[in-house]
Amino acid sequence: MAVVIRLQGLPIVAGTMDIRHFFSGLTIPDGGVHIVGGELGEAFIVFATDEDARLGMMRTGGTIKGSKVTLLLSSKTEMQNMIELSRRRFETANLDIPPANASRSGPPPSSGMSGRVNLPTTVSNFNNPSPSVVTATTSVHESNKNIQTFSTASIGTAPPNMGASFGSPTFSSTVPSTASPMNTVPPPPIPPIPAMPSLPPMPSIPPIPVPPPVPTLPPVPPVPPIPPVPSVPPMTPLPPMSGMPPLNPPPVAPLPAGMNGSGAPMNLNNNLNPMFLGPLNPVNPIQMNSQSSVKPLPINPDDLYVSVHGMPFSAMENDVRDFFHGLRVDAVHLLKDHVGRNNGNGLVKFLSPQDTFEALKRNRMLMIQRYVEVSPATERQWVAAGGHITFKQNMGPSGQSHPPPQTLPRSKSPSGQKRSRSRSPHEAGFCVYLKGLPFEAENKHVIDFFKKLDIVEDSIYIAYGPNGKATGEGFVEFRNEADYKAALCRHKQYMGNRFIQVHPITKKGMLEKIDMIRKRLQNFSYDQREMMLNPEGDVNSAKVCAHITNIPFSITKMDVLQFLEGIPVDENAVHVLVDNNGQGLGQALVQFKNEDDARKSERLHRKKLNGREAFVHVVTLEDMREIEKNPPAQGKKGLKMPVPGNPAVPGMPNAGLPGVGLPSAGLPGAGLPSTGLPGSAITSAGLPGAGMPSAGIPSAGGEEHAFLTVGSKEANNGPPFNFPGNFGGSNAFGPPIPPPGLGGGAFGDARPGMPSVGNSGLPGLGLDVPGFGGGPNNLSGPSGFGGGPQNFGNGPGSLGGPPGFGSGPPGLGSAPGHLGGPPAFGPGPGPGPGPGPIHIGGPPGFASSSGKPGPTVIKVQNMPFTVSIDEILDFFYGYQVIPGSVCLKYNEKGMPTGEAMVAFESRDEATAAVIDLNDRPIGSRKVKLVLG
């Protein structure tokens, strides 16, 4: 429904285009702007919808052409009444204007002369006599002579004392050449007119001696005697003079005030143009008032430009011209980003404001395959974008050329120049949106980031979350466009050790985002604020939240509440995670009132939720916020949950040899950074129970050893790769340790390049294992262990293996002094050569081509420098990470490098983590996972 708004305070120099620019972005139909004027400078604007009118009312107090305007709600009835009242006031004012000779000195014309006002009817049919030939239309002698003839001679010698009779409003307009002297020189007094005798019949008028000849007039009937002043009857109209030029030249100026007493058009049988302004003497025309002369309106240079947003990046200048087909496009300038590519925006210059006005009607129309926005622009924007200005002689409506507007250079002083429209309310403002700010960032850091740029005072806004911590978002407004463009060029530059994203944003969009942030803070419940502001409880570290995963993508809040039935949960505390398109991610976050309720929710782990097993994990408030900002993605295996390990064996937990650091299906204590025991590189394996460093073997070399031996700077990190199990003492092995007489020397004694027993640099790892050498005794695991296909050769001496050790040959050595293993991990001799082998129980598939190899290390790169070990463990939640194996890397100055090493219990687990979590974010950065 159309809504009418009343505007007051409109300056006299403003037009409809200025009003439309003031309400740019709102829908005003054609013919919807009505300027009434008056003392208050009123105008009425008709908006297409209620929403447009509401947005328009919000612009009250703005300026049009430097004048502050006020907006009021109105109606169509009031608008029509005001327009009609203004029209009547104008007509009444014209009727009240006195005639041109109203101020003359001298006696008024006598009543007897009133009959002469009909004399103009005698010349109404003089079809366009030339003003240079005829200077008057009739003449009546004031003497007692009889009128014998009617000729141009008598017309041209009309006595000046007849000026009073020509002063009537209906006749004075026909002789404008005498108006000026009549106003300044008073006419002589008119003598009394004696009574005229009866006039004889007038003879026929001879032809006028002016070519072409004028046909004779019919005889004039005799005038009866009229006492005291005879009245002259109207004469018969003369036939048209075909040879005379027209009397009605085209208008050259508006009618000056006072020339026509009534202000109404001249009524000479309506044969003359009512706007006839040509003087009777073209050689010496009347000097009109400069204010009333017709001059072409000066063209505001800002009315020639429009801005186009949202164009396809592949759009060229021809596409823009095709989009504005039918309009006169002067030039097109496509804007580019800092790399030199089209950014989808551009400026277009037209030849006339009418073309600009028509171009604005094409807002939100299709260009190629995208809908573009067309908005007004200024010449200042055109110049700032690199556009060129060509000065041309602008042709006005009257065909007169006038110099181009002086627009460059513009001084800062507004005096003497037309003010630019760039400061009008419809401008978007020079605002930017910052993302990725450091959490400890303050206003001074933002000012330093945009140093040497002019920032609007108190315009820096840094967003904070409900917990009082910065969210990494911010807004800045600049004073001018040059600084604004320079700020956009600092996109992805570093503030401290984090790069900042700088995005353009309109001032309206900035205010909406700030308002949304404030509403988010206001909607946060009072209880939650109290809990977070309570320093005693340290709620941030309390696990009062739950992360529910592996649920259907179409899940809703009500479904989650029904799933948590029996646990008190506020509806506003349930958040279903969605992506940027509003599609569900199959995850939900729930915040409970206390830890007891959160622990109760763990009972629902792996319960069915809409047909799928829901995984419920209890997390802290900080974890919940991090998950809400960067939801973890579900890979092929989903959000993996811990799976039960191998069944425990008495004396051998986790189906390994904890005494030698074998917590699972390999030798994690051996510090195998790659695949456990590669076939040709057995030197990369070590037994920490036998005095080998758990982080690797120095002789192995490589980056990972040096990486893992760097001391951690965090107190909770502990020694690198401190694997579970007892690495020292008499109870290190599950089975009893063989007596010292079983063999001479230790593991490392017979192996060149291996560190000697007890030389481990890690506490608790230096265990002298007496007698893993040759001898007739066995050290074996329980009989329940399945068969491993490899054998270890027996006997003291070197520890070696033939080529292809990892590929599963029948035996790993036939000479005495080798270490072998039985096929069934049980007592009894194996098929491998060598008498009296010593059997060491190993996990299934150890150093074989089948089953799971040993622990595998993953290198994590490109992490935030402030990342903690807990955050890394949360990132790998659901994968079998060896506890205590996370090691952060620091440089020589002790600063974090954003890299870490994480050990997994098997290579399959590490491979799955790399496939599922590579390029996933930790904080605001995507991490890279490299399999060791």
Swiss-Prot record:
InterPro entries: ESRP, Nucleotide-bd_a/b_plait_sf, RBD_domain_sf, RBM12_RRM1, RBM12_RRM2, RBM12_RRM3, RBM12_RRM4, RBM12_RRM5. Pfam families: RRM_1 (PF00076). The lineage of its organism: Eukaryota, Metazoa, Chordata, Craniata, Vertebrata. Its main location: nucleus. Residues 408-417 have a biased composition (Polar residues). It is found in: Nucleus. Residues 824-836 have a biased composition (Pro residues). Gene3D superfamilies: 3.30.70.330. One of its GO terms (biological process) is regulation of RNA splicing. Residues 304-379, 430-507, 856-932 form the RRM domain. The modification Phosphoserine is found at residues 352, 375, 420, 422, 424, 525. The keyword Nucleus applies. This is RNA-binding protein 12. The keyword rRNA processing does not apply. Residues 98-116, 717-734 have a biased composition (Low complexity). Residues 97-116, 393-424, 717-853 are annotated as: Disordered.
